[in-house]
């Protein structure tokens, strides 16, 4: 069976983990944590980065920094992972779900402004498959209404937004705050792991305090205070040096990893462009808007209906290939229906929930396997 995902190891992970253990500093915020954070800040232009134990934790930190309180409204796309909404629900937010575009799963920026009320505190955008949302439009709306923008960039490492003036900005560097994932399904990994990026300077000091269990420990270690104490809310968000050491091995090979994934993505796109199935209607290829780049986090197809998708997945499974669907629309989840009185009609989110299917894409997927997958799909 060709798996959907296989975590890639560069060969340096165990060496760096051993180095971290031998250093005598493995509890977190040591050498490897600093190396990783400095790399991301320099490479992608983030003002401040803090590694976390997961992207969920990074989103929860963002919710605290945005000062989300009971009754505040937060606009979130419905077609996303539960953490995107849950991080804000935990702070008491009333989630207002937004629909996707009809031709790609990202939040429909043209629908956002109609969802804003006097209670709206934040807009959370998700760069699905590592492909940018329309950030110029979203930031313009947010700035007009004085609303914080948080980028859920879990899938978007090393992907960019291109403004109309040609300016190229890394995803995660545009909103006030952003969150990344290094889960084993992502392009670069640490098993579990994430990162909060702070692009608005007013949040940096408090972010460090929240990251360090509500203490000003970071300031103490920089010699800015003579002792540290409990000064704010927070939790134990920082990862151990073992996780950071693993991540550093991945970072060192990021360009090679990205180049290989993009090569696979491009071959899928080329090979399936002329696909004319007989047993199902022709699925749609992924859309990368002109303002976005592609980091090859995911290759998906959009079937015409749920029955076609079921037939597609079963056909590949019968041939030894694991393909998978993705999110169920959060506005239809049992938890949301229980806690919220809002009733939303989000047809595009529902369509992607019913029709989107993802193909295997990982570093060690061979050329022969890619061709086999393409040819197997063409048998439909």
Residue ranges and their predicted role:
Residues 62-116, 122-124:
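Conserved PLP-anchoring active-site segment centered on the Schiff-base-forming lysine
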Residues 86-88, 141, 170, 242:
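Hydrophobic/aromatic ligand-binding patch that stacks against planar heteroaromatic rings
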Residues 103-190, 195-202, 358:
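Active-site phosphate-binding strand-loop segment of PLP-dependent enzymes
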Residues 1-26, 229-231, 360:
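N-terminal "arm"/small-domain region of PLP-dependent enzymes with the aminotransferase-like
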Residues 26-73, 86-91, 97-98, 164:
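Phosphate-binding glycine-rich loop
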Residues 33-38, 43-49, 110, 122-126, ...:
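PLP-dependent aminotransferase class I/II
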Residues 91, 144-145, 319:
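Helix C-cap/helix->beta junction micro-motif
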């Amino acid at each position: 069976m060709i798996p959907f995902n296989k975590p890639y190891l560069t060969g340096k992970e165990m060496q760096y983990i051993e180095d971290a253990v031998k250093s005598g500093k493995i509890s977190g915020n040591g050498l490897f944590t600093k190396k990783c954070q400095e790399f991301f800040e320099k490479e992608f232009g983030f003002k401040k980065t803090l590694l976390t134990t997961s992207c969920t934790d990074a989103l929860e930190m963002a919710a605290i920094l945005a000062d989300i309180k009971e009754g505040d409204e937060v606009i979130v796309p419905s077609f996303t992972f539960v953490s995107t909404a849950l991080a804000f629900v935990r702070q008491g937010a009333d989630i207002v779900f937004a629909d996707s575009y009809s031709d790609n799963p990202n939040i429909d920026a043209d629908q956002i402004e109609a969802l804003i009320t006097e209670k709206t505190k934040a807009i959370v955008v998700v760069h699905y498959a590592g492909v940018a949302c329309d950030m110029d439009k979203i930031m313009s709306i947010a700035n007009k209404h004085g609303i914080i923008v948080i980028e859920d960039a879990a899938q978007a490492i090393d992907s960019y937004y291109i403004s109309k003036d040609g300016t190229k900005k890394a995803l995660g560097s545009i909103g006030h705050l952003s969150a990344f994932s290094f889960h084993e399904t992502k392009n670069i990994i640490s098993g579990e792991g994430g990162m909060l990026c702070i692009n608005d300077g007013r949040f940096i000091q408090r972010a460090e305090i929240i990251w360090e269990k509500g203490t000003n420990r970071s300031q103490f270690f920089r010699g800015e205070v003579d002792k540290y104490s409990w000064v704010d809310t927070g939790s134990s968000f920082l990862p151990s040096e073992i996780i950071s050491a693993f991540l550093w091995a991945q970072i060192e090979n990021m360009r090679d990893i990205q180049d290989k994934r993009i090569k696979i993505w491009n071959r899928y796109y080329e090979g399936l462009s002329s696909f004319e199935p007989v047993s199902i209607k022709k699925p749609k290829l992924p859309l990368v808007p002109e303002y976005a780049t592609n980091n090859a986090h995911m290759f998906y197809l959009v079937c015409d209906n749920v029955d076609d998708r079921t037939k597609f997945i079963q056909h590949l499974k019968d041939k030894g290939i694991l393909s998978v669907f993705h999110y169920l629309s959060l506005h239809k989840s049992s938890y949301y229906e229980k806690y919220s009185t809002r009733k939303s009609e989000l047809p595009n989110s529902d369509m992607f929930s019913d029709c989107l299917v993802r193909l295997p894409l990982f570093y060690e997927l061979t050329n022969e396997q890619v061709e086999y997958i393409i040819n197997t799909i063409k048998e439909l």
